[in-house]
A protein has these predicted regions:
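N-terminal membrane-proximal hinge/A-helix region immediately C-terminal to the signal-anchor transmembrane segment
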Residues: 1-32, 36, 40-41, 45, ...
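Classical protein tyrosine phosphatase
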Residues: 1-3, 7-9, 105-112, 206-231, ...
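Cytochrome P450 heme-thiolate monooxygenase catalytic core
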Residues: 18-27, 60-212, 246
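Cytochrome P450 heme-thiolate "Cys pocket" and heme-binding signature region
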Residues: 52, 247, 324-355, 379-382, ...
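Cytochrome P450 heme-binding "Cys pocket" and the immediately downstream C-terminal segment
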Residues: 223-225, 348-385
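Conserved cytochrome P450 K-helix/beta-meander segment immediately N-terminal to the heme-binding cysteine loop
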Residues: 299-327
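C-terminal helix/juxtamembrane-tail motif
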Residues: 384-398
Length: 398
């Protein structure tokens, strides 16, 4: 445990530490020949295409879409009221993700169906799934049905786009996935395209909605920090309500560090898993250990990022720990909010962009106070770790 011991985990190649076997339980959700079920060559093509779709040139086109979706959603709040913040931000993050990743046609015409099917896919992932992915349960039955229907939906979208290519602006990732050709010359199938879209949504949805919820709660709970965040927003955007630009989001350093700190204290995944494909030597605190071939290797962001040796006063929410001169995250393999090394999350730039744009609008336009005193507990009993219980807040338009 700790940065030194974790170095071998995050520097290892797939030939040394494999993800495929330990995440095999996701195959019924993602589908065959998708991500970890694909051959190594095809998986590289899929991952490279994902990475291309999340580069700066495309991210620049997403800011206006995320802001527009956020403002449309918040119109329904009115001047004041109460809401479960986690539920609200979960709805908002999937709206913005669908607009950016799936495209305008999906968001406009079939979003409700996609959202309902995603719900059944998500709830088809239970603790039992890890050990028995195809157990004859109601959750798994709904999961399998939802995936079949999701493929049918996107098959129609793909056919429409092939017939009428001008209807898409080409900035969404679905457009990129449709163009995938593997090194053997074969073309990607609609089933695989759907699986990649599901995988991308799975990877980002929980992290974005949970981190935006925790960030909102932590910042709103500390009035002096909230004042600083709003001051930063005013310095970047001014008092006018001009549209947010990509360059504006890049300047939101304090808000960035607030999200980063929320993920340090409350990471969405307790464990990251690998299977040792060969014996591996690990050094820690002057000692050397051997991880035998065949063992399951685990790194826990939850434990590692609360180590006082790496992050002093680890139980204190302190976004300034990332700013100069402290920069406590700079030590390699210490900050694991988005994994690390060769398999660090390729969607982290999109996640920061999405959450910062949403919170820029939300925190400038609303005062938020949690109805119950203090901060919620962390729900460690869940597969994906978020706030425990409800997150009901009172809001008042500023």
């Amino acid at each position: 445990m700790g940065p030194e011991a974790q170095e071998v985990f995050f520097k290892a190649t797939d030939d040394q530490l494999s993800q495929a076997e330990v995440y095999d339980f996701m195959r019924p959700v993602f589908g065959k020949n998708v991500v970890y079920d694909a051959s190594k060559k095809n998986r590289q093509v899929q991952f490279q295409t994902m990475a291309n779709g999340l580069r700066t040139a495309r991210l620049k086109a997403y800011v206006s879409k995320i802001e527009e979706e956020t403002r449309m959603y918040l119109k329904n709040w009115g001047e004041s009221g109460e809401v479960d913040l986690l539920t609200a931000l979960s709805e908002l993050t999937i709206l913005t993700a669908s607009r950016c990743l799936h495209g305008e046609d999906v968001r406009t015409h079939i979003f409700k169906e996609v959202q309902e099917l995603y719900h059944d896919l998500d709830h088809g992932l239970t603790p039992l799934t890890v050990f028995w992915p195809n157990a004859p349960t109601e959750a798994h039955r709904k999961r399998n049905k939802a995936r079949t229907e999701m493929v049918e939906l996107f098959q129609k979208v793909i056919k429409e786009r092939e017939l009428y290519p001008d209807r898409s602006d080409g900035t969404d990732i679905l457009s990129l996935f449709m163009q995938i050709k593997y090194k053997d010359g074969s073309k990607i199938t609609a089933d695989q395209v759907t699986g990649l879209l599901i995988a991308l949504l799975f990877a980002g949805q929980h992290t974005s909605c949970i981190s935006s919820t925790w960030t909102s709660l932590f910042v709103s709970h500390d009035k002096s920090l909230l004042d600083r965040v709003r001051k930063e927003q005013d310095e970047i955007l001014g008092k006018s309500k001009r549209p947010i630009q990509f360059e504006d989001v890049q300047k939101m350093d304090l808000l960035h560090n607030c999200m980063r700190e929320a993920l340090r204290m409350c990471p969405t995944f307790i464990m990251i898993l690998r299977k040792a494909e060969q014996d591996l030597k690990v050094k820690s605190e002057g000692k050397t250990f051997i991880i035998p071939k065949g063992d399951i290797v685990v790194v826990s962001p939850t434990v590692s990022m609360r180590m006082k040796e790496t992050f002093p006063n680890p139980d204190t929410y302190d976004p300034d720990r990332y700013a100069a001169p402290r920069e406590e995250h700079k030590k390699p393999y210490s900050y694991l909010g988005f994994g690390g090394g060769v398999h660090s999350c390729m969607g982290q730039n999109f996640a920061f962009l999405q959450v910062k744009t949403i919170l820029s609008v939300l925190l400038r336009e609303y005062d938020i106070d949690r109805i119950e005193p203090g901060m919620p507990d962390i729900g460690y009993e869940d597969m994906v770790v978020g706030p425990k219980g409800n997150c009901r807040v009172k809001y008042q338009k500023r």
